Amino acid sequence: MGEPIKNRYEFVVLFDVENGNPNGDPDAGNMPRIDPESGLGLVTDVCLKRKIRNYVEMVKEDSKGYEIYIKEDVPLNRSDRKAYESIGIEETDDKKIKEAVKKLKKTDPDVDIKLRDYMCDNFYDIRTFGAVMTTFVKAALNCGQVRGPVQIGFARSIDPIISQEVTTVSYTHLRAHETLRHL
């Protein structure tokens, strides 16, 4: 898997978007995010991390140590199950998981740390960006917080952007098609 990142690095990434919307704002009808004072386009850190996650998932294709924890439209507890299985808990019901963890903690008080280590060893995005392991709290576990070495801020465009809506025309009936053709 390679050495973990040990030093701090600062870098700039330039990317080009032409006739597109790199990060629509759901609160504004999915229009591009724009700084109202400067007119510069914005791309959130969440969007940039999603692009990195998608790239790693595509390139590494489930290689050991490169799974993605925060996936689009996939509940986190699906990945949590893999962590539970790594410590010998096969249960799927939350109540039974909690009971199994309680029983396991009597013989292994470091179960919280083992789960956290499993998550870091297997999930690229947790190891890279960090995570707050709150999904394990319902099983009476305290896996804490992982601080990732890679921190990403908002991206800003170099030049102001102009947001334009593009309208399309479609017809649903043959009569409408004939009318449009003769205009």
Regions found by a protein language model. Give the residues of each.
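Residues at beta-strand starts and edge strands
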Residues: 7-11, 146-148, 181
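An N-terminal structural lobe/cap that precedes and organizes the functional/catalytic core
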Residues: 2-82
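A generic structural micro-feature
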Residues: 5, 144, 174-175
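Generic structural motif
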Residues: 18-20, 155-157, 179
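Extended, compositionally biased
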Residues: 57-171
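Conserved small/polar residues in nucleotide/adenosyl-binding loops
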Residues: 172-182
